[in-house]
Curated annotation (Swiss-Prot):
Coiled-coil annotated residue ranges, if any: none
PTM annotation (Phosphothreonine): residues: 554, 858, 964
GO terms, biological process: chromatin remodeling; circadian regulation of gene expression; circadian rhythm; fatty acid metabolic process; gluconeogenesis; glycogen biosynthetic process; lactate biosynthetic process; negative regulation of circadian rhythm
Compartments reported by the entry: Nucleus; Cytoplasm; Cytoplasm, Perinuclear region
Name of this protein: Period circadian protein homolog 2
Domain PAC: 393-436
PROSITE patterns reported in the protein's UniProt record: PAS
Record gene name: Per2
Induction comment from the UniProt entry of this chain: Oscillates diurnally in several tissues, mainly in central nervous system and liver (at protein levels) but also in pancreas, bladder and lumbar spinal cord. Rhythmic levels are critical for the generation of circadian rhythms in central as well as peripheral clocks. Targeted degradation of PER and CRY proteins enables the reactivation of CLOCK-BMAL1, thus initiating a new circadian transcriptional cycle with an intrinsic period of 24 hours.
Main location: nucleus
Superkingdom, taxonomy of origin: Eukaryota
Motif mapping: LXXLL: 306-310, 1051-1055
Length: 1257
């Protein structure tokens, strides 16, 4: 609006109006020029063409205005005006032509004032009538605004001309005409214009304007382009032609069609007019303008100016030729809860006749048919109930620009603010069902539009606003991108219901359908809405993949532990949560975003690495607080973020699927929302419980569970009950979040120390994380192939019955990581097909509770600390229905067994030297009834029973998955194995030391079996069994086992010197080979037991665990016949530097049971330095605080430790003899009072096997 169109008085028949003031033409014409710039809308003849007294009134107002004008402040202004009138208009009766000119000028003045009054906003009118004074003030203010805009442009150009002009090409006038002609010559309704960004003047305009506007091209010469725009479109023009927003022409020219379509997103709409088409009206025509940035050289040798090159195309009605096909007459609008348009799709322009800026911030109800306005209240009630989900409703009639009504079929949805749970805006996707009678929607309305809303409209708007101010119930939308918040197909159906055949318009709309308004947030929401269907499809496809399923199920399993979260968690997680607690909605929303981003970045990798989403047994009881500390003792950095997201959304879920959580929560939405009667067929919780039934996929399980949704609707859950339940869950979630955050301070300080302690095993950390899912792709190289199946099966064996922190399982040699999943159980536990020979089922050494001395034939009760709901199969020693095995002198509450079939090697049918109490009771195997006749005890060394101090067991067995041919619900049998050959058992008997017991204790505590001291004394040694490679996959622990897990063939080299490690494979002849200080297999670099069963987490690794997992080699029952092949496998799979070194080491050196010695003083010095670092994080109390602490805690006054943690030895220690060293296991929970025993503790039989190994830190 830099200037205005000058209107010369048109000759009309003279009309005398006596008594009317007759100001001079010069003075009045100047006033008209100053105030008539905002000349009219489509038709500006809507004012009264008054005569007589009306003219007198207008003349009086004008005279009063001139007299009081600030530009003529002197008191004799009126006199001066009258004198001027007298000089230029002498009163002569013969000058009729002069009188006629005066009359024409006065009439033109009055008409111009009326045109200005039409543009006066309604809020500036007094009692609905526009006064001349208010109109002229409004015009003057508009002129000042335009001048301010010009000054702004000049300042902008002076500051930005240098950076903007660097890459902007410069063209002459002829070149501009040449580069634009190829675009506009093909379209008669398009023209090109170059507008200076400095002065706003038109430097170039194409010849097509003459035919489009029916005027001469000279009308645009030396004029400002905004003079030809409709007044309310000037601001839109300025906002879209800001220099830094404009793409340079050189970038846009010569590009492919897709890029050009993308650049069309910069286009906007304006109305342009040139002069009058009729006597009393100015007709504007709508144009779509696409701006570009160029430099134009106006004259030869002159300096180039930054210009905006506009390609303007006239917009025709969508109902006139060329018509828009009926199936593509679709557009989208959004409006606020107070029923004001927030954004309008550009596709609405040819269908409604309105430009986007015409509707934005105007009432929606005003544009509707009066009979349809009450429907909007019902529609908004349903919008509130739908909670963001789209739905169709009754058609509504919408008024177009020409005053006609069109009928629209609309799909309504909403966006819910995740923080406030209130509706932010409503989205309407409209499809024109019936077009207008007058197809020219851009025609002027026959009557002026109502300026003030009808009272009923205002009342209805208030009702809708009050309605939408209520929080949306948690019925199905997480409020974050809630157009597809639940990933349900219902949204896709409802979207296509109103636009089934949108065709290519959809793709174009996604590129160029961004609203040309200042509301950027609405634009983003619109884009999200348009692509919602495709996003949901991709999300659904992602969910169908095994990785997504595993991740979702794992999340639920971790979260089902409930109270375990505050006790222990990841160091990274706690550090992440070291923030002020936010609201539930904020945490849930951030959780959704994190998991969505992780799913996008990890989906491809996880899909390639995970193969068994349904092989995760469920927990059927509340897990003890120590669960996560054991699981997450050594998290990898990659895993930590996943774990944070998992725990952020942790809500205690019921045992049944009364509250259904959508699987989509793991990628884009919160998993804490409770859905009742939801149509999504992915109830996670029941899916988790049913996963144990077999190797069927998660989708299959979820599909079966979807049929159980019917009864859910009959449970009597009302909105009130659901809201109360949801609020309770949210409060519990926030409470646990705060409790976990309290541990962040201590955990953050310990993290550096823990990382330093485990530097040497950084390469193995990915194998000991919690989920096992991430560990499968943590490693690279050849190990990646081996890790593909090493996903941790999350059975309840990770929980402890005593409630203490859980220790890590030592690595299992020759076992398959997936053996305990339902899909592989048939291979791991008992083979489905018989083999030539059955090796006896060696038991796991089970330990009884402290103070109980086992004797042969004695039945020891299982530990009482097991969790409720876990099945504890205890077979009495005297009753063995299926297996002809003999009871073990130790307590066998779980009594697992593993039969290992050898294809060719004949084993002795019986073992006369085997003690009566060697083998434990074996549980019943219903799936393999014939196995009892096949399995016979192998020759083993005698194990004279001896009394020993036993420890408190830690048992957490779980109920077996249906269809799993595994040991009742005992934990994997090989987790408790102490040896697999007579020689190994001999060594076990000879060299069983406190560390062996503690290692086994930690192991068994981790795996969920009873942990107790192993009673072993000296016995006669026997020769090794001949080599016979295993053919059956055996269970393994992915958390602890990796490519360096021992191979059964490798251990043939080591049986002569091998100790009885707690990680031995029961029947693979691999046993557990480790040095006397590694008996928790920390030598393997795995997580050791809670009792510290392992050497230091630095570099003291065993020289005997250097082979591949037999489950990887023998997954398809492959056999390795001899030691030479074993050695080849050693060299093939050993990838970590230590194992590569050991693989190339001579066998004689490998069998020396020697470990690199460390200087005791150096170790102590390092420890002292680390303690000094940790000392800084010790709390410092003021004197007042210390006084309060002494009053409450007496031990603070004495300077000692609390009784609960002031222990002289570890609870797992078998003996408290001199020299025992109890060290806390750093990687576990930092809870006080939990300590480990070093693996370096030796016992009586130590002198029989070799020198004592010092404990390493």
């Amino acid at each position: 609006m830099n200037g205005y169109v000058d209107f010369s008085p048109s000759p009309t028949s003279p009309t005398k109006e006596p008594g009317a003031p007759q100001p001079t033409q010069a003075v009045l014409q100047e006033d008209v020029d100053m105030s008539s710039g905002s000349s009219g809308n489509e038709n500006c003849s809507t004012g009264r063409d008054s005569q007589g007294s009306d003219c007198d009134d207008n003349g009086k107002e004008l005279r009063m205005l001139v007299e009081s004008s600030n530009t003529h402040p002197s008191p004799d202004d009126a006199f001066r005006l009258m004198m001027t009138e007298a000089e230029h208009n002498p009163s002569t009766s013969g000058c009729s032509s002069e009188q006629s000119a005066k009359a024409d000028a006065h009439k033109e003045l009055i008409r111009t004032l009326k045109e200005l009054k039409v543009h006066l906003p309604a809020d500036k009118k007094a009692k609905g009538k526009a006064s001349t004074l208010a109109t002229l003030k409004y015009a003057l203010r508009s002129v000042k605004q335009v001048k301010a805009n010009e000054e702004y442009y000049q300042l902008l150009m002076s500051s930005e001309s240098q950076p903007c002009s660097v890459d902007v090409p410069s063209y002459s006038m002829e070149q501009v005409e040449g580069i634009t002609s190829e675009y506009i010559v093909k379209n008669a309704d398009m023209f090109a214009v170059a507008v200076s960004l400095v002065s706003g003047k038109i430097l170039y305009i194409s010849n097509q304007v003459a035919s489009i506007f029916h005027c001469k091209k000279d009308a645009f010469s030396d004029a400002k382009f905004v003079e030809f725009l409709a007044p309310h479109d000037v601001s839109v023009f300025h906002s879209y032609t800001t220099p830094y927003k404009l793409p340079p022409w050189s970038v846009c020219s010569g590009l492919d069609s897709f890029t050009q379509e993308c650049m069309e997103e910069k286009s906007f709409f304006c109305r342009v007019s040139v002069g009058k088409h009729h006597e009393n009206e100015i007709r504007y025509q709508p144009f779509r303008m696409t701006p570009y940035l160029v430099k134009v050289q106006e004259q030869q040798g002159a300096e180039s100016q930054l210009c905006c090159l506009l390609l303007a195309e006239r917009v025709h009605s969508g109902y006139e030729a060329p018509r828009i096909p009926p199936e593509k007459r679709i557009f989208t609008t959004t409006h606020t809860p107070n029923c004001l348009f927030q954004a309008v799709d550009e596709r609405a322009v040819p269908l409604l006749g309105y430009l986007p800026q015409d509707l934005i911030e105007t009432p929606v109800l005003v544009q509707l048919h009066p009979s349809d306005r009450p429907l909007m209240l019902a529609i908004h009630k349903k919008i509130l109930q739908a909670g963001g989900q789209p739905f169709d409703y009754s058609p509504i009639r919408f008024r177009t620009r020409n005053g006609e009504y069109i009928t629209l079929d609309t799909s309504w949805s909403s966006f819910i603010n995740p923080w406030s749970r209130k509706i932010s805006f409503i989205i309407g996707r409209h499809k024109v069902r019936v077009g207008p009678l007058n197809e020219d929607v851009f025609a002027a309305p026959p009557c002026p539009e109502e300026k003030t809303p009808h009272p009923s409209v205002q009342e209805l708007t208030e009702q809708i606003h009050r309605l939408l101010m209520q929080p949306v119930p948690h019925s199905g939308s997480s409020g974050y991108g809630s157009l597809g918040s639940n990933g349900s197909h219902e949204h896709l159906m409802s979207q296509t219901s109103s636009s089934d055949s949108n065709g290519q318009e959809e793709s174009h709309r996604r590129r160029s359908g961004i609203f040309k308004t200042s509301g950027k947030i609405q634009t983003k929401s619109h884009v999200s809405h348009e692509s919602g269907g495709q996003k949901e499809a991709s999300v659904a496809e992602m969910q169908s993949s095994p990785p997504a399923q595993v991740k979702a199920v794992t999340t639920i399993e971790r979260d089902s532990s409930g109270a375990s979260l505050p006790k222990a968690s990841f160091p990274e997680e706690l550090a992440y949560k070291n923030q002020p607690p936010c609201s539930y909605q904020q945490i849930s929303c951030l959780d959704s975003v994190i998991r969505y981003l992780e799913s996008c970045s990890e989906a491809a990798t996880l899909k390639r690495k995970c193969e068994f989403p349904a092989n995760i047994p469920s927990r059927k009881a509340t897990v003890s607080p120590g669960l996560h500390s054991g699981e997450a003792a050594r998290p990898s950095k990659v895993t930590s973020h996943t774990e944070v997201s998992a725990h952020l959304s942790s809500l205690t879920l019921p045992g049944k699927a009364e509250s259904v959580v959508s699987l989509t929560s793991q990628c884009s939405y919160s998993s804490t929302i409770v859905h009742v009667g939801d149509k999504k067929p992915q109830p996670e919780l029941e899916t988790v419980e049913d996963m144990a039934s077999g190797p069927e996929s998660l989708d299959g399980a979820a599909g079966g569970l979807s049929q159980e949704k019917g009864p859910l609707q009959k449970l009597g859950l009302t909105k009130e009950v659901l809201a109360a339940h949801t609020q309770k869950e949210e409060q519990g979630f926030l409470q646990r979040f705060r409790e976990v955050s309290r541990l962040s301070a201590l955990q953050a300080h310990c993290q550096n120390y823990l990382q330093e302690r485990s530097r040497a095993q950084a390469s193995d950390r990915g194998l000991r994380n919690t989920s096992g899912l991430e560990s499968s792709w943590k490693k690279t190289g050849k190990n990646r192939k081996l890790k593909s199946k090493r996903v941790k099966t999350r059975d309840s064996s990770e929980s402890t019955g005593s409630g203490g922190p859980v220790s890590h399982r030592p690595p299992l040699m020759g076992l398959n990581a997936t053996a305990w999943s339902p899909s592989d159980t048939s291979q791991s536990s008992c083979p489905s097909a018989p083999f030539p020979t059955a090796v006896p089922a060696y038991p796991l050494p089970v330990f009884q509770a402290p103070g109980i001395v086992s004797t042969p034939g004695t039945v020891v009760a299982p530990p009482a600390a097991t969790h409720t709901g876990f099945t504890m199969p205890v077979v009495p020693m005297g009753t063995q229905p299926e297996f002809a095995v003999q009871p073990l002198p130790f307590a066998a509450p779980l009594a697992p067994v593993m039969a290992f079939m050898l294809p060719s090697y004949p084993f002795p049918p019986a073992t006369p030297n085997l003690p009566q109490a060697f083998l434990p009771s074996q549980p019943h195997f219903p799936a393999h009834p014939t196995l009892a006749s096949e399995i016979t005890p192998a020759s083993q060394a005698e194990f004279p029973s001896r009394t020993s101090t036993l420890r408190q067991p830690c048992a957490c067995p779980v109920t077996p998955p249906a269809g799993t041919v595994a040991l009742g619900r005992a934990s994997p049998p090989l987790f408790q194995s102490r040896g697999s050959s007579p020689l190994q058992l001999n060594l076990l008997q000879l060299e069983e030391a406190p560390e062996g017991s503690t290692g086994a204790a930690g192991t068994l505590g981790t795996t969920g079996t009873a942990a107790s001291g192993l009673d072993c004394t000296s016995g006669t040694s026997r020769d090794r069994q001949p080599k016979a490679p295993p053919t059956c996959n055996e269970p393994s622990d992915t958390q602890n086992s990796d490519a360096i897990s021992t191979s059964s063939d490798l251990l043939n080299l080591l049986l002569g010197e091998d100790l009885c490690s707690a990680t031995g494979s029961a029947l693979s002849r691999s046993g557990a080979s480790a040095t006397s200080d590694s008996l928790g297999s920390s030598s393997l670099g795995f997580g050791t037991s809670q009792s510290g069963a392992g050497s230091s987490d630095t570099s003291h690794t065993s020289k005997y665990f250097g082979s591949i997992d037999s489950s990887e080699n023998n997954h398809k029952a492959k056999m390795i016949p001899d030691t030479e092949e074993s050695e080849q496998f050693i060299k093939y799979v050993l990838q970590d530097p230590i194992w590569l070194l050991m693989a190339n080491t001579d066998d004689s050196i490998m069998m020396t049971y020697q470990l690199p010695s460390r200087d005791l003083q150096a170790v102590l010095k390092e420890d002292q330095e680390k303690l000094k670092l940790l000392q800084r994080s010790q709390p410092r109390f003021t004197e007042g605080q210390r006084r309060e602490l002494r009053e409450v805690h007496p031990w603070v006054h004495t300077g000692g430790l609390p009784t609960a943690i002031d222990v002289t030895g570890c609870v797992y220690c078998e003996s408290e003899e001199k020299g025992n060293i109890c060290l806390p296991y750093e990687e576990d929970s930092p809870s006080p009072g939990l300590c480990d025993t070093s693996e370096a503790k030796e016992e009586e039989g130590e002198q029989l096997t070799g020198p004592r190994i010092e404990a390493q830190t």
